Amino acid sequence: LNVDVILPLLNSLAERYQENLSHEFRSVAVINQLEVPYDVYRYSKDGINYYFISCGELTREKLYGYSDDCRRYELYCYLTLDFIEKCGLKYDVVHCHDWLTGLVPYFMKYVFMKRSNYFMFTKTVFTIHNIHYQGICDVSDLAIISQFDSIPNEVMLFEKVNFMKTAIVISDEVTTVSKTYCNEICYPYFAEGLDRFIVARKDHLHGILNGVNYNYNNPA
């Protein structure tokens, strides 16, 4: 089993791992009239490659908590696929976590697969950790989707872009962090307005108990 991890390069990560980061790739993503230059750095540990995407709008101190988070993570989702394709990385599965990665399945299906067959045999899995946080914004808040003449219904909910809903509807499979949570989010009380989309995907919804090895993953 070969596993790579692709993350945004936060300032805190760049400072912490600067001695171990190697510059891997530089490119410019061209989306209609938009050009986004970006760099990718690599850190390897225990046989796993960690790729960090760096570009002006994406790089911040914290993972989220900014007014332009949706725009930042729209770019992150697109640049992740742009990097994978341009570097010739082949994955059987792209595993996305929570709303920040919610547009990866959309871009793969509606943008990248429209212009090439590179991702033809790649499946997507989306894991819901917390359905409360959905990544909701206006189309005009986004750098890429705002350029498109038409936007699929899968992306929209109540006239807003909804990252979480997009991934639930488009991903090949959807998982949650436990069987209990998997059952709970099928009901309106727990689903934060997304229950009908979750129930519609119930044959592709799986509750998988997750956890952390606290002896190995100990920041102390």
Residue ranges of model-derived segments:
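Catalytic cores of nucleotide-sugar-dependent glycosyltransferases that transfer UDP/GDP/TDP-activated
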Residues: 1-220
